[in-house]
Amino acid sequence: MPQDVRFDLPFETPVSKHLESARARHLRWVWEMRLVHSREGFEEYRSWDLPQAAARTYPHASADDMVVLMNWFSLAFLFDDQFDASRPDRADRIAEVARELIVTPLRPAGTPPRVACPITLAWTEVWKHLSHGMSLTWQSRFAASWGRFLEAHCEEVDLAARGLEGTLGLVEFTEFRRRTVGIHHSIDAGERSRGFEVPAQAMAHPVMERMRDLAADTIGFMNDIHSFEREKRRGDGHNLIAVLRRERGCSWQEATDEAYRMTIARLDEYLELQERVPQMCDELRLDEAQRDGVRLGVEAIQHWINGNYEWALTSGRYAAAKEGAVATAELAGRGSVDDLLTV
């Protein structure tokens, strides 16, 4: 089964020692912020085990910061599931909420949202903590990556609302997937989790830019493989395996094998570029402190590639079968048990 597909990743990453204590605080917060309304929705959310994802991708965060990062994961993942195929007009509300999420980092931290719902209220609180202590340069970079991700999500929802979800060709899809996977700003958050910043000149270098793109591709493709059963069950055509099968007229297994090959190719190219990082630092004439920032930035990418992979192998989010209210919601074309876009 796709969720069981294994990759031989060349690096291991730690898991935060704060996982269990932060998990308890986080789950209370999710309920208090009404990011889940029902017992069924809460149990489904718990099965995803997003706290493990945060603990693996940001293993060096402090106890308090780990809770903030878990909280951020919750609102982002839950917002991703808000489209309802039986209500195409839902796309307009999603776009309205997405615009609010995009502009929040551009306002003074803590400014109440103009569009109020559980998702925007939660993001306002999270951003106040997530941005604390970071430079305007970092905040602007994060906001740009976050905005591109949310805009791409709206494009995806709009395609689904118009019945065009499965119409992208492979080249177009892979470029689109790089934006919808939401990895660039997630790697940026790795800097916040350890209290450092990658020098701006390194971030602008073609080697670092390509490494981040390849990391996004690698993670996005692995995610498409591991989530395939869930997305096939929901009729979601925004998946690499589905695109390959449609474009090449092959079997599901052949499409899965090709998706695996494409993932390995992206990972191999990433590893080749990673070996060129010292040369990049020499070229930019970085001092020791700046080189440390680059080194930690590369570790942040590794934490995301390996941490997300390890989490996806066991997360209930990608389980092959669902029961009860969750199964009913999926059969009705809803991605979520609870509506989080209204007050």
Swiss-Prot record:
Protein residues bound to Mg(2+) 1: D80, D84
Q: Which UniProt keywords apply?
A: Lyase, Magnesium, Metal-binding
- Give the GO terms filed under biological process for this record: terpenoid biosynthetic process
The annotated site for Plays a critical role for substrate recognition falls at D81, E156
For substrate, which residues are the binding ones? Answer: R177, R230, R317, Y318
- The residues that the entry says bind Mg(2+) 3 are N223, S227, E231
Which GO molecular-function terms appear in the entry? metal ion binding; terpene synthase activity
Per its UniProt record, the required cofactor names are: Mg(2+)
Task: Copy out the cofactor comment.
Answer: Binds 3 Mg(2+) ions per subunit.
Q: Where are the transmembrane segments?
A: none
State the pathway, as annotated in the record: Secondary metabolite biosynthesis; terpenoid biosynthesis
Gene3D superfamilies assigned to the protein according to its UniProt record, in alphabetical order: Farnesyl Diphosphate Synthase
Motif DDXXD motif: which ranges? Answer: 80-84
Tell me yes or no: is Metal-binding among this UniProt entry's keywords.
yes
Q: Name the enzyme's class.
A: lyase
Annotated catalysed reactions: (2E,6E)-farnesyl diphosphate + H2O = 7-epi-alpha-eudesmol + diphosphate
Q: Where does Mg(2+) 2 bind?
A: D84
- Where does the record place the site Plays a critical role in the stabilization of intermediate cation? F77
Q: Could you tell me the EC number(s) of this protein? A: 4.2.3.169
Pfam families reported for this sequence: Terpene_syn_C_2
Annotated NCBIfam families: eudesmol_syn
| Family statement | Belongs to the terpene synthase family.
What does the record give as the function of this protein? Catalyzes the conversion of (2E,6E)-farnesyl diphosphate (FPP) to yield the bicyclic sesquiterpenol 7-epi-alpha-eudesmol via a 1,10-cyclization, which requires the abstraction of the pyrophosphate from FPP to yield the (E,E)-germacradienyl cation. The only accepted substrate is (2E,6E)-farnesyl diphosphate (FPP).
Q: What is this protein called?
A: 7-epi-alpha-eudesmol synthase ((2E,6E)-farnesyl diphosphate cyclizing)
Its source organism is Streptomyces viridochromogenes (strain DSM 40736 / JCM 4977 / BCRC 1201 / Tue 494)
